[in-house]
């Protein structure tokens, strides 16, 4: 059986461009949705053209033109959507419902991977307002997929290293501190940190794998399941210096929600669930899930001490 043809929706974005790269590297005929709304966004256009030079095929279609979406979907076997659900950048998760309708009408798709790539929204029904909107919208998309009997794989990629590791999980910065660091509670709750390129590699490996059909794939490589303290220690070893640590209690952390703008409240809520509640590792993977590093032991995933070296 040949490798699936792949359509990436959101191929110029933070995750999307990595998915495109991984798809091409793994030998898939790779299509990228090119939306007329790109307008005068020269940077996005340059990314698309660079992928075209590498062999990707650009397909013009618009979310405001159902037929164009159906025609685009009919060209491929697998659709991967990477539209942003991050509130401080752009937030388009429910736009995927139009893509679900197109996939349903096209009738040929063997696998759809919607824009997930974070915490498992099925486990976040208790999430704090207003941050729960992200999970609620992802569940709305899931419901539409499953009601339409579209074959799916959901990717739970946990904490992107660029947002959570490079800054030692400090809010309002993307760079690691060199003197003082804020510790969440006792710092012993375990998140999972993932290099974004590894997220893309694991994602592409799932698309033709019968073991991942209609399942959630959790990215939990064992050496990247680290407490906040352990992550900080890796940085301290790299720079040869102990940081001054100040702990913030759960109560005090939640009190910082007051007076913040909407996007910041969403972020604080998500940090609470990750670093105080431990929502990424406080459950066993059930029969409807698989763990990526167990499925694909051949992937030499990036460890966080290795990841942090570039910040030194």
Swiss-Prot record:
GO terms for biological process: lignan biosynthetic process. This is Isoflavone reductase homolog. GO terms for molecular function: pinoresinol reductase activity. It is an enzyme of class 1 (oxidoreductase). Its EC number is 1.3.1.-. NADP(+) binds at residues 10-16, 35, 44, 142. Belongs to the NmrA-type oxidoreductase family. Isoflavone reductase subfamily. The active site is at 138 (proton acceptor). Keywords: NADP, Oxidoreductase. Gene3D superfamilies: NAD(P)-binding Rossmann-like Domain, UDP-galactose 4-epimerase, domain 1. Substrate binds at residue 270. InterPro entries: NAD(P)-bd_dom_sf (IPR036291), NmrA-like (IPR008030), NmrA-type/Isoflavone_red_sf (IPR050608), PCBER-like (IPR045312).
